[in-house]
Amino acid sequence: MNTFLFLTAFLTFVEFNCENLFDFRHDSLKNDIEFTPEGDRKWTERKYWNKLNNISKAIISCGIDGKDWHLPDLVALCEVENDSVMRDLTKRSLLRNANYEYLVTNSPDERGIDVALIYDPMHFQPIRHYPLRIKPMEGMRPTRDILYVAGRIITDDTLHIFVVHAPSRYGGEKPTRPHRMLIAKTLCGAIDSIRLASSDPNIIIAGDFNDYADSKALMQLQLHGMKNASHDAKGSNGAKATYKYKGEWNSIDHIMVSQRLYGMKVFGRINDQTFMLEPDEKYGGVQPYRTYRAWRYRNGYSDHLPLVVRFALKQPD
């Protein structure tokens, strides 16, 4: 009789909407003039580097786990402008010694907003990656690509990752609902393709869905066997969700995982370190500490808070 000793390795996954992580240079092909020195935000090189280091600090703090600390293994980011921003974030900011690598989309979004995946190559080795382009339906503006990445994790299993930033509710929730359903339909098709090749795959879908856990789009993913690993996530310093609007906490950011990974979940939480919060003077309690309040520069972090989910992976010794 053969006896195997299984060791536990942990994988920490973070999702974070950075809120307008733009560089300070104008892209003539995009509507990004607002975030330039001449634009309405007076977005200078100094403000840009402040923002990069603030986002870095937020990511680093996601690794705090009680008395222990470790850098996240994978970080899904929304609202990053381009490859140049990601290079500065991973190679020149406070993250420069973390040895992170990254993958980023180049979407047709009119403002130039993209999604990206940061990864520790010691714990995740990409095998293939490509964008899933969303063909706009009638009345829908060009939107962000979905980033798909498949890679090897420490157990030598394949992990499939989708990074999503779904169309917003601007113009009303009901009129824009089909836009987000289109994202869900695209993801369900991709999941089906993966399952044709693997009966029990490891899948993570993470990002800003601009929808709640009980929305039709999220329910469609659940009907396709995905579980919401962040449904019970709470902060420890007053955050009840990742996003606060007019005094109401709501989670529009989600980390959805396949059944197999859901069984490996250790915890899901909101990273609401006190330095990422400020008093909510109008509605009470606290709120995310943003880069701007209206048009006033605050040198904050984001209007979203990061989600953190940790998994325990079994590997044979």
Task: For each feature predicted by the language model, list its residue ranges.
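N-terminal, active-site-proximal structural segment of metallo-dependent hydrolase catalytic domains
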Residues: 9-95, 103-115, 185, 282-285, ...
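Active-site-proximal beta-strand/loop segments in catalytic clefts of secreted hydrolases
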Residues: 16-19, 78-80, 104-108, 120-121, ...
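Active-site His/acidic residue clusters
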Residues: 29-32, 157, 162-176
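Structured beta-strand-rich core segments of catalytic domains in phosphoester-bond hydrolases
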Residues: 74, 80-166
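Metal-dependent phosphoester-hydrolase catalytic domains
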Residues: 189-203, 210-317
